[in-house]
Design a protein with these regions (language model features):
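Active-site and adjacent substrate-binding regions of carbohydrate-active enzymes
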Residues: 1-194
Length: 194
């Protein structure tokens, strides 16, 4: 947590959900149907693991890792539609809980929207192909934050989601420049204070 995070948040109960494995249906609607039970457990905040589409290229297993994100600005269609996600977040709020989502900004899937449209924003191996700095993460390509246009894109994406959710859990945050996070916090606070 950031230094200026409200102390009361440090004692909140988080309930983590990976939508794909949460129920047999693996959908936003199935999570929504279970919210009363989750609330009764004393939950204050629901933390959703990545909600975005998973890449196809170099998948780990048949389903792939949810941290190999194909499009930061979309929801995984296996989980439902964007409207289904909005309904879930509204239902969470209706029960007095908050919702946070995972933000995976160090890397994407190698066949992501960003890799297709902005390959220059990625780390490249000596042979020129997209790569990552960790050998066992073969299903992802690392982003290169020396490109300020990438900062703009990522911050706009955070602001988009901040209009829906209450906050973010930032995966491998130390691998993304601290200055990026400082700027992102300032800009997101203009959309969702606190």
């Amino acid at each position: 947590m950031a230094v200026d995070t409200e102390k009361t948040l440090r004692n909140q109960v988080l309930y983590s959900i990976y939508v794909r494995n949460y129920s047999e249906a693996g959908t936003f609607a199935a999570v929504q149907a279970d919210l009363d039970r989750i609330k009764a457990l004393g939950t204050d905040i629901i933390w959703l693991l990545p909600i975005h589409p998973t890449g196809e290229k170099h998948r780990k297993g048949t389903l792939g890792s949810p941290y190999a994100i194909r499009d930061y600005r979309a929801v995984n269609p296996e989980f439902g539609t964007l409207d289904d996600f909005r309904h879930l977040v509204d239902a969470i709020h209706d029960r007095g809980m908050k919702c946070i989502i995972d933000v995976v900004y160090n890397h994407t899937s190698p066949d992501s929207w960003l890799a297709e449209h902005h390959p220059e924003w990625f780390f490249h191996k000596p042979d020129g192909s997209l790569g990552n700095r960790f050998g066992d993460w073969w299903d992802v390509a690392d982003l290169d934050y020396s490109h300020k246009e990438l900062w703009e894109y990522q911050i706009e994406t955070l602001k988009y989601w901040a209009r829906l959710v209450d906050g973010f859990r930032c995966d491998v945050a130390p691998l993304v420049p601290l200055e990026f996070w400082k700027r992102a916090r300032e800009e997101v606070a203009a959309v969702r204070p606190g």
